Amino acid sequence: MSDLEQLERQILEDIAAAADEPAIEAVRVAALGKKGSVSEKLKTLGSMTPEERQAQGPAINGLKNRVTEALTERKTELRKQAIAARLEREKVDVTLPVRESAASRGRIHPISQVIDEITAIFADMGFSIAEGPDIETDYYNFTALNFPEGHPAREMHDTFFFNADEKGERKLLRTHTSPVQVHTMEKFAAIRDKEDRDEPIRIVIPGKTYRMDSDATHSPMFHQVEGLVVDKSANVANMKWVLEEFCKSFFEVPSVKMRMRPSFFPFTEPSVEVDIQCDRSGPHVKFGEGNDWLEILGCGMVHPNVLRASGYDPDVYQGFAWGMGIDRIAMLKYGMPDLRAFFDADVRWIEHYGFRPLDIPTLFGGLSA
């Protein structure tokens, strides 16, 4: 056996015996390092005659290549073994009982729960859920909704505007979920015109909205839900019935008295604010009884300008819409004193006010059972 064959055999045995990456690195340095055994062999090529170099060069370089390949294979094998050992060590037995702790149980956030409750109620009435982008254009957020030029909501101190683009146009974080109404009406109008299929619109729109406001009852990011009905026969009586049914179901009372007060919103005409009967004498508000009134939402008939901007003839179609703050009605229903706590990610708070994951709201089983 030649010296090169003996050296190769020894190095390959050392590689096979290496039990971890530090050991394989030590073998590499001993063989291919600056003073390694293979490196020393390579250095001798410089002192050989051309004939000797031609004979010995391929053998020595072949040795180097085989050692390098063996080192790479062993290193890969060791890494796979390490990963397999770690997976085995950290394996979780999913059949074990869950540890009873706040972190392991988990809770559904009240906002998510209330959104599920609201959508369950309106789904039972035949409404579908619609969504839209949080970043909107001035047109969809204001102009198409009949906000006049110079309206306070268009000012920088009320609305989060982005920097203008190269065309001088500014986008913004939507200040309400109402732009989704326009998007939806445009889509339905396009289907009507293209396919000659005139379907009524019945949608409910939950989502995040943004305004420059922050205190115990206001947040710069908050949640709204609104609804829209557009049909040839939609009227105020329909709207009143829908809202009464919603309030009874949401607050889980057999009956509720509603008071409708004239108001003003740019996108509805007439516009109304709705109060419901309640008792505020105790620590928590009780709905469906008492002598107090509490404002709960705003609503109205869709303004003709909004219908027109969305592709509907106001002489043929009517619509009604309503909207409310999800955070606020969650606070009212479940007795939460400070809106800011909704966004603090405090595990103790969510443990107290949160809901079990299997508390899925249904009208049959009770929304907050």
Curated annotation (Swiss-Prot):
Cofactor dependency: Mg(2+)
GO molecular function: ATP binding; magnesium ion binding; phenylalanine-tRNA ligase activity; tRNA binding
Record-level GO cellular component terms: cytoplasm
Record-listed Mg(2+) binding positions: E269
Subcellular localization: Cytoplasm
Signal peptide segment: none
Cofactor comment text: Binds 2 magnesium ions per tetramer.
Record EC number: 6.1.1.20
Alphabetical list of InterPro entries matching this protein: aa-tRNA-synth_II (IPR006195), aa-tRNA-synth_II/BPL/LPL (IPR045864), Phe-tRNA-synth_IIc_asu (IPR004529), Phe-tRNA_ligase_II_N (IPR004188), Phe_tRNA_ligase_alpha1_bac (IPR022911), Phenylalanyl-tRNA_Synthase (IPR002319), tRNA-bd_arm (IPR010978)
HAMAP family, per the entry: Phe_tRNA_synth_alpha1
Protein name: Phenylalanine--tRNA ligase alpha subunit
Annotated source species: Brucella anthropi (strain ATCC 49188 / DSM 6882 / CCUG 24695 / JCM 21032 / LMG 3331 / NBRC 15819 / NCTC 12168 / Alc 37) (Ochrobactrum anthropi)
Name of the gene this protein is made from: pheS
